[in-house]
């Protein structure tokens, strides 16, 4: 799909929908487009993935908040794979989607739902509930200057984290010993416990204590990782930061966190954006603000001054009689919206410099000018200044 659809549109829900309503909508879409029900249908498979991606974001309060504020740019993509931050192409396979589906609805995890669409019987809670371990998230900070924010930028991070064990390739087993079905849960990953109550016998399904929900146990543990399937290592990750990001915004890159045990689901890489202060410009959302200090003669007779922008200095014409407090607007010289909807402006706040000391000649000149009616504020000017002052308290 060339252009990403709105996640709410994908699941046919609204921004006011609850998590339960979103879960219900996802379940409906997953049943409709599940590969077992649509064998060989690539379009259905893509819609199945699309629905899973939408659910992954909208069911998570943090991801949903970022998406509501910044759209798809808030879940921005990783350089090189084109996948979405927090999406599936960055680190989740179809198996992972199936596993997530099983976790949500009590279905079977793995390469499918068990030899045909009937595997969806897990919805009732009676199916197997094999568990996949998810690795923990990693958090990093990235400091950006206004130039980088205005254009977007790629940043490389050298991450020290848990990766799949190089000796056992993440299985946790030594050599070809592999694993065997858990004798306690018979491979289901869960056990049923009976409890006598005043209402009779109550049955509850819980995670198997022997295999921790995996449905299998390792016969001969890897001598390098001790059967965990992970080891400490390094990875260099390139992150594409979209233009228009702001201080405090958190991006997430799916699948680039710590590896999950036994080839489980990797965690996410969370990137917290920090802004470097600019020596002359101040950010106000997508606008930039510059405080211009004019000399009195320039304000009175006009002229041209250089104004700093992100892309260098530009000359701006100053009209004769420019008053302190006037705001000049340079359209399109601000920052782009992270959603891609327009660009802010550069606002130039004008102040007039009054010298603190004067020579005798300068003082004499000003005393002569003071007698001119042009140097005496008119009633209309006084009223204008008073209205501006009063508006500060409204």
UniProtKB/Swiss-Prot annotation:
Write down what this protein is called. Chaperone protein DnaJ
Q: Where is the J domain?
A: 6-71
> Among the entry's GO cellular component annotations, what is one?
cytoplasm
The annotated subunit structure for this chain is: Homodimer.
> Per the annotation, how and in what number is the cofactor bound?
Binds 2 Zn(2+) ions per monomer.
Quote the PANTHER family the UniProt record gives.
Answer: CHAPERONE PROTEIN DNAJ, DNAJ HOMOLOG 1, MITOCHONDRIAL-RELATED
Per the similarity annotation, which family is this? Belongs to the DnaJ family.
Q: What is the lineage of its organism?
A: Bacteria, Pseudomonadati, Bacteroidota, Bacteroidia, Bacteroidales
Q: What does this protein do?
A: Participates actively in the response to hyperosmotic and heat shock by preventing the aggregation of stress-denatured proteins and by disaggregating proteins, also in an autonomous, DnaK-independent fashion. Unfolded proteins bind initially to DnaJ; upon interaction with the DnaJ-bound protein, DnaK hydrolyzes its bound ATP, resulting in the formation of a stable complex. GrpE releases ADP from DnaK; ATP binding to DnaK triggers the release of the substrate protein, thus completing the reaction cycle.
- Which HAMAP family does this one have? DnaJ (MF_01152)
**SUPFAM superfamilies on file:** Chaperone J-domain, DnaJ/Hsp40 cysteine-rich domain, HSP40/DnaJ peptide-binding domain
Essential cofactor(s): Zn(2+)
Zinc finger map (CR-type):
152-234
Q: Does the keyword Metal-binding apply?
A: yes
- Residues annotated as binding Zn(2+) 1: 165, 168, 222, 225
